[in-house]
Amino acid sequence: FDENIFLYLENDDLCKRIIDNDENIYIVPRSKIKHLGAKAVDEKYEYEIELSRNWHWVWSKFYYNKKHYGLINAYIKVCPIFISATLKMLLYFFINKRKKEIYLFRMLGFLNAAIGRKSFYRPKINY
């Protein structure tokens, strides 16, 4: 696994590298996996997890595309998400604080990836 990827696209990255090395990926059609999504974390942290998801989704998307297809392709693929997040953040600025912050975190994930910062953001959870 690429240790730079904290969350999102780690499976895509692994499969891409396997294919690029002319190795095989096996599919088990009858296999089933139930993904519970953040069930290991107390529900009181749900919003913090949502912020983290949005930050890492955009960061990982930019990083993955830059790594495998180059910087220009990363901008082409991820700039529309950044522009959309910016517009939505402005739309929700005065009417919905939570949605405003979610789109702000998408923007921050993009900006940090674009300037080459590592995937540093972690949810603020106290056990």
Q: What positions do the PLM features span?
A:
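Acidic donor-binding loop at a coil-to-helix junction in glycosyltransferase catalytic cores
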Residues: 4-16, 53
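Short linear sequence elements within intrinsically disordered, low-complexity coil regions
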Residues: 6, 13, 69, 74, ...
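Generic secretory/membrane-interface signal
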Residues: 5, 29, 55, 115-118
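Membrane-interface aromatic/basic loop that binds lipid-linked glycans or pyrophosphate carriers
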Residues: 99-127
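Active-site-adjacent helix/loop segment of glycosyltransferases
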Residues: 16, 20, 24-97, 101
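Generic hydrophobic/packing signal
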Residues: 11, 22-23, 31, 105-106, ...
